Amino acid sequence: MINRTILVGRLTRDPELRYTNGGAAVATFTIAVNRQFTNQNGEREADFISCVIWRKAAENFANFTHKGSLVGIDGRIQTRNYENQQGVRVYVTEVVVENFSLLESRAESERHQAANGGSGNNNYNNGNSNYNNNNNGYSNQGQNAAPQQSSANNNNPFGNGNTGNASSAAPSSSANNNNQADPFANNGDQIDISDDDLPF
């Protein structure tokens, strides 16, 4: 059985970082994902998907993202339920994030934030950061969230800045040392890609 979710979209609000009674960090946020088709008015509609991320990855996510940030999310869908203070059973469906990537540069993110009048967090790692969240699940009964242990997962479908043929595309000069975080910084050079490597 497969339960895998990959999303690319923008945050609808700043991530909300909290800590469980056991001291584990947990951040919740909502990501807006545009649909692939347009409605009758020619506009693209969006789906708003609730997400949760745990531990150190949650702290990193909260520190490096803000409302409007473009992110890639890799995780799984989870449905849980709890009884609220009024005694009503509440069902929640959300994506438990295992990996994420920041998909825009610091300058683009700041430009987007300024255009929207936001005042989020400005701590970035040049737009090429990838984070793994090794928590594969949790149970949450109201305020007493308790993380479950799981094996480490280092698979990242969004890649990291050091994979692929980026090294063959970069010149061997001192400028290369300054651009290691951005494999596409030397955009004037040719890139050796065969037709078999292209997804279309």
Curated annotation (Swiss-Prot):
Biased composition (Low complexity): 121-187
Residue ranges annotated for the SSB domain, each copy included: 1-104
Motif (Important for interaction with partner proteins) on chain: 195-200
Subunit structure: Homotetramer.
Parts forming coiled coils: none
GO CC, one annotated term: nucleoid
Alphabetized Pfam families for the sequence: SSB
Protein name: Single-stranded DNA-binding protein
Function according to Swiss-Prot or TrEMBL: Plays an important role in DNA replication, recombination and repair. Binds to ssDNA and to an array of partner proteins to recruit them to their sites of action during DNA metabolism.
UniProt xrefs under InterPro entries: NA-bd_OB-fold, Primosome_PriB/ssb, ssDNA-bd
Highest taxon of source: Bacteria
Keywords: DNA damage, DNA recombination, DNA repair, DNA replication, DNA-binding
GO biological process: DNA recombination; DNA repair; DNA replication
Start and end residues of each stretch annotated as Disordered: 108-200
Gene Ontology molecular function terms on file: single-stranded DNA binding
